Amino acid sequence: MNSKYLFVFLILNVIFIDLCQGFLFNVIPHAINATASLIKKGTRRRELGSQYDYLQDFRKRELDLDDLLSKFPDY
């Protein structure tokens, strides 16, 4: 009778250890990766803000070039 309970106890321990191992080696790294991607998104937003000024200057130069080319006569 005692061996039956011991066997059930061992099976339950194996199942519990497997669940814990799945949690430690699956959920925790995904949480770390999610945190890292959130940090990267924050820096990306700042980079896009600095690129906006560059793109605005580029559009202004493009409009100036179009204005300059429109003054040339057509051949």
From Swiss-Prot:
One of its GO terms (biological process) is regulation of defense response to virus. GO terms for cellular component: extracellular region. The keyword Cell membrane does not apply. The modification Lysine amide is found at residue 41. Expressed by the venom gland. Residues 1-22 form the signal peptide. Keywords: Amidation, Antimicrobial, Antiviral protein, Secreted, Signal. It is found in: Secreted. It comes from the Eukaryota. Residues 42-75 form a propeptide. Belongs to the non-disulfide-bridged peptide (NDBP) superfamily. Short antimicrobial peptide (group 4) family. Shows a low ability to inhibit hepatitis C virus (HCV) infection in Huh7.5.1 cells. This is Peptide Ctri9610. It comes from Chaerilus tricostatus (Scorpion).
